[in-house]
C-alpha cells in the first residue's frame, strides 16, 4: 500500500538534473498530492538508498517586541504543542540585566502550560525570546562564543550526525549535552555555526555540512535570526503586529496573538528580526522540497 513521492524541479518542461527529496505516503494520498507537483511511483521500482526522512517532529516560536514579550512567547510556543511530546523550552533576553533566562521541561507526562506557567515570573521584563516543542533534543541551548552570546533552537534531522560528530571531535571540540544517550543535534549545529566569522557565515557552514534538514532560530542581544532549511523542508512563517515581529513553524498562533502573516521565509533564507524591522542576511534558494507530511500528518489544519 506504500508509494514513494518525488518532488522534482523542472527546467523548460524537463526534469532538472538534481537530487530529489523523497518521502513515504499512503496510497490514498496519491490523488491529492499529485495535483501539487508530486509524482507517485511504485516503491519497489525505486532504490531505498535515496529515501530521506524529513525531520523529527518539532516546532518553534520566536518574538521580538518594543514591550514585554512573555505572554506572546508562552502562548506562541504552546501553539506548537501538536508537533512534539517530549521536551519544551523557552529562552528570553533581558536587556536591563543583560542576561539570558532559560527554562526547559520534560513534557512526556505533563502539558506545556502546566509545566511553564509557574515559572513565567522569571521572564518578566524580557522583550525578545524563543521557544521550542521538541520530540528529541533538550533545548534551547545558550552558547557563549566569539560571535557573542546567543540561544538556539532547531527543528532538525541530521542524517550524517555520526560523521559530523567525529569531525568536530577531531578538531578538539567537545559535546556537553546528550539527548537519550546520543549527541544533542542542536549542540552539534551550534558548534558548526560558531566556526563562521559571522552568524550568516556560520549558518551557511551548517547548510554546507548537514545532510538532512535543519531550520533554526537564534536569540541574540540584538534580536532574532531566523534561518530556514536550505531545501525548505520545514517552514518558517513571519508575522507582525504593532511594535513586534514573530517567527514560527506554523501560522496557527498568529490570529489569537494579534499578528498578521507578513511573509514566508524562503528555502535557505536568513533573516535578522528586530522590533523595528526585518533585514535579509541571505537570499532564498530558487528550489524548494518541502515535507509533504505537513499537509497530511503533523501540520495543524488551520495553519497556512
What role is predicted for each listed range?
Residues 7, 17-18, 27:
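Polybasic, lysine-rich low-complexity intrinsically disordered segments
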Residues 52-267, 272-304:
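Conserved short alpha-helical segments that host acidic/polar catalytic motifs at enzyme active sites
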Residues 38-56:
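Short, Lys/Arg-enriched N-terminal segments with co-localized hydrophobic residues
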